[in-house]
A protein has these predicted regions:
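N-terminal binding-site loop/beta-alpha segment at the start of enzyme catalytic domains
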Residues: 1-73, 132
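Conserved, mostly hydrophobic/aromatic
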Residues: 6, 18, 42, 50, ...
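Short, well-ordered coil/turn segments that N-cap beta-strands
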Residues: 9-16, 46-49, 70-74, 100-105, ...
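Active-site mouth loops of central-metabolism enzymes
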Residues: 21-33, 77-86, 209-211
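Glycine/proline-rich, positively charged
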Residues: 26-27, 63, 83-199, 204-205
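Conserved short secondary-structure transition element at the edge of the structured enzyme core
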Residues: 43-44, 184, 188-250, 264-277, ...
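Short hydrophobic/aromatic-enriched beta-strand-loop microsegments
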Residues: 72-77, 158-166, 250-256
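Ferredoxin-like iron-sulfur electron-transfer modules
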Residues: 253-272, 283-302, 316-318
Length: 318
């Protein structure tokens, strides 16, 4: 698979990366050995870039996969939501131990929202120190927000940025409002021009765009400002689909079968705003005892109307 450098980091990654979140306990909850085999399969077929996070609880899948073969030049990115110095440094050390890696290639502040940069100065200092101490090779942030992505372009120490973008503009934020793919692409372009490594997330909008598989991938892979596209996988067949697409052998009419997909609402991200409930035509979304949204699968039509309106991307189709 074609590889590119992540900005000026000197780190070379496959143009498609493997997002490990879907196989973990937040979504599919695959047995570790089963998930590890999928990762190993992708590594064997040229994908060398893996994305995980402290929050995902997926380190065991990666650790097990790396023991299944002699894989060279594997690049691992992890992230943490910790805002303070000690919490972030502990997160880096936890990743090193859990992944059995002396150095974590990339470590990010996870899902930075508008107005949060000042709140995370302790975490930022920890990442700077971690790089100085040789614990990480590069550091930066991930965000769904245009203003944060734009700000990243002028952060001198920042090496990489991991923004959300897709052809439908789903989930792109700016302050407390939704934004557009055009605004996000402009922010990404500024990061790229500044020498920052850029790899993107949510090409399928959290699963909502999977039924437009090739259109979704055409959009992100056509952008020279994006060094790599992170795709979430939970099956070997999904890896094969991507390989077929990138290899140019996929039938132009092909779209994956999404008839068995289910809607899942991540309770740790949900804010109970009611947007998804209002959008559901089947009355399948209700509030639980904690005031958070859940899905009654006996009523759910899997129409996907709920996912695009969630301001924090807590609604996922898998």
């Amino acid at each position: 698979m074609q590889k590119k450098f992540l900005g000026n980091t000197g780190i070379k990654v496959s143009i498609a990366g493997f997002g490990v979140l879907p196989m973990g306990p937040s979504q599919l909850s695959l047995p570790v050995e089963e998930g590890a085999k999928i990762i190993a399969y992708a590594l064997e077929h040229g994908i060398n870039f893996l994305d995980t996070a402290q929050y995902y609880r997926t380190y065991p899948y990666i650790s097990s996969a790396l023991k299944m073969g002699s894989f060279e030049d594997v690049v691992i990115c992890s992230k943490s939501l910790c805002e303070d110095y000690d919490g972030m440094m502990d997160a880096v050390l936890e990743a090193r131990k859990a992944l059995d890696r002396e150095v974590i290639d990339i470590f990010l502040m996870h899902e930075v929202r508008s107005g949060q940069l000042s709140l995370r100065q302790g975490a930022w200092k920890a990442l700077k120190d971690a790089k100085k101490e040789g614990l990480v090779r590069a550091f930066g942030l991930s965000s769904h927000h245009v203003d944060i992505t734009k700000a990243a372009s002028s952060m001198e120490e920042l090496d990489v940025v991991f923004p959300l973008i897709n052809y439908a503009g789903l989930g792109i934020r700016k302050g407390d409002s939704f934004s557009t793919k055009e605004e996000m692409l402009e922010a990404i372009s500024q990061c790229h021009a500044a020498g920052k490594g850029v790899f993107s997330m949510k090409a399928f909008g959290g699963g909502s765009l999977t039924g437009h598989y090739q259109e979704a991938l055409d959009y992100v892979f056509s952008k020279p400002e994006i060094d790599s596209v992170m795709i979430g996988f939970g099956k070997i067949s999904e890896v094969d689909d991507l390989l077929s697409y990138l290899g140019g052998t996929m039938d132009k009419s092909y779209n994956p079968d999404i008839s068995k997909k289910r809607v899942y609402i991540n309770q740790e991200d949900c804010e109970g705003c009611g947007s998804c409930k209002a959008a559901c035509p089947a009355g399948a979304i209700f509030y639980n005892e904690n005031g958070l949204a859940e899905v009654d699968h006996s009523k759910c039509l899997t129409c996907g109307y709920c996912s695009p309106v969630c301001p924090v991307r807590a609604v996922i189709m898998y």
